[in-house]
Structure formats: structure tokens, C-alpha cells
């Protein structure tokens, strides 16, 4: 995947495709309209988050595998992506990443919620760009730090220190610009005039994933996400009930997306917020039980959960869908708090938690380098979790950190 994205990284500016040097693609299509150029999506770059996410993935792969050879191979592409963030992504020099389409044919909104009406103010008026999405700033923070870790692993100390300084500068500015005490969470976005879109959204949950939010803010964001207006019983809605454009049957303004919830779960785990994490997992697990073949769909409607009834299907949701499928592993990883230390040949389970209805988890062939391990984890009274190694192949250590 990293090589695939790197091979398609933009090398020149092309307004028709929203392409700029170093930018990572948003999507590629092979239909007739794309092939004839009627729509710009043959190879389209109108996504403000794909580029920092690419850097995050490259850093995560290095930390997971210790593969410095691949990191060295990808480094020119990581450098180009970071350069795009600085030169093109930050449109006005304020340190935040913003977007705005360059032609009328491009996407009006270029975050993961790319519906035309997905970014708005509390009164329902659409935000005018360039728009700085809240979650994208968190991704940028993680990308600067991830790039720094790659640079340091490759012996580029001066570069690493410069990237760390950029991450710290963004962290200092972020909270002041985005925090909205009146709604108990971060703003959905800043518009082109730097006015906050004071809307309760799932986007704010992604902020927990990268460490840009202080601990006290993370706890407050989690509480807001798990309020009935946001948490429908099956998962966190994209937009909270009561917001101006809330519609539980809409694509991005009140529905529930498993991948969205998976990222929130990882953030909750990072901050040690175990109770909301277990509650979130319970909703998604129950939703899967009601779905055909026990799969999580791309999304479902955000109507409140009722006794004896499953979630309301979104009629044209993909099933299966890659994002949704990955969310199951994200949530499991969040529960178990699994991290990898290739340099120490160690797998760690940090503050693992299992919900009351899940007594045991068995994992086979969990790999680290050329070694692997089979293990089982049990839940005990008092929410304690124990671990037992069943089989070990090669040199590998397993540790539980509570």
C-alpha cells in the first residue's frame, strides 16, 4: 500500500485534479466518465488528509516492523509529503492545514466527510473556505512527529528536530483555536475567516488518536461523544442530534460509520479511557450481530437504539467495505492496547480491557519480525486481564503493562 501510494504521489501542479507536488491521491476510478475526463476522478488528489495520513502510516509501519530498508526507500516520498504540508497544505501560513478546491468540478469538501454540506456552522450555514478541519490538524501533528521518528531512525537528527519543532508549534496553537467550552468539545472546523464551526461532531474524536489534545480535554471530548445526542447506542454519530443539519439518514450528518468509531476507539485507548471504550465496542459489536453475515457495513443510520430492534440500514452502504472491515481490528487493538517494539523484540499489551460479555480472546501467529507467538487473554473479576503464552516461535517477549 505504501509503495502504491508513493508511486502515485503528485509531481506537478494540476488544478483540474487538485494535484500539487508531494500530495497523495484521494481516489482513482476506471469508469467511462473518468476515462473521458468528464469527471476529474481518474487520478484525483482532492483530499487534505491523505498526505499526512501517508506519513503517519509510513511511521507506523517502521514502528511495527523495524524495516529501515523500506523507510529509506520511502523517505523521498515522506519528505515530499511533508513539503506539501508546509508549502501547499498550509495556505495562509498560520500552521494549520486547509483545503479549497481549485476548479468547480472538484470536491467542495476534502476531508473524509466529503459531502457538499458536511462542514457548517452552528446555525446551519455552510462554511466558506479555505477550511481547516479539526481532525486534519491532529493528523498533521502526528505526521510531523512520525516524519521525525523516521528521520531519526535514518540518522537525520537535524531534520528530526525541525519536524518535532513544527509539531510542538502546532500543538500550542491548536487548543486555543479549536476548543469550544460551550459545547464541551473541539470545533468541527475553522472557516476561511478563522471562525470556529461550533458543532458537535465525531471529527473531534479523531483528535484523541494523535496526542495533540491535553488529557483533560480528551476526557471531556470522550464524555461529549458518549452523550445520548452523539452516541445512538450503536456507535457515535457523525453529527450530534440537535445540530442544525443533523439527519440520521444522511450520509455524513448523523449516520454512524464503523471506521470513524474505530479511530475514536484507538484514541480512547491511548488516553486510558476504558469505560467509554468498552461502551463504544459494545454498540459496534451488537450492530454487527444484527447485520447480514455479521459484518459491519460502510455506515448505518443514526436513529436511537430501541429494544428488540437492530440499527437501521443505510440503503446503499457498501457491505463489505474496507474501512469498516478494518475497524474491527482497530477496536480489538484498542481494547488490548497492543504495541510493538521491534528493537526490543517485544510485544506489549498496555492497560488491556475486555468487556463483561467477552471472557477470553485467543490470538494465533501474532508476528514480530521473523518470530511469532500464540496467546490467550482472560477477563477476571474487577476487570483484570491476564495473559498466557501458548506457543512461542523465535525470539520474542510478551509483556502486560497495567
Question: Where are each of the predicted segments found?
Answer:
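Substrate-binding cleft of carbohydrate-active enzyme catalytic domains
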Residues: 1-7, 11, 36-92, 126-145, ...
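Extended, well-ordered alpha-helical scaffold segments
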Residues: 1-8, 68-86, 139, 143-147, ...
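Extended glycan-interaction surfaces of carbohydrate-active proteins
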Residues: 3-45, 91-132, 172-256, 289-313, ...
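Active-site-proximal structural scaffolding
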Residues: 47-50, 71, 78, 133, ...
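Well-ordered alpha-helical scaffold segments within catalytic/enzyme domains
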Residues: 53-70, 84, 136-157, 206-217, ...
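Beta-rich accessory regions
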Residues: 150-177, 181, 268-279, 344, ...
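Active-site-proximal binding-pocket segments
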Residues: 255-261, 272-281, 288-296
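Catalytic cores of secreted or luminal carbohydrate-active enzymes
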Residues: 314-362
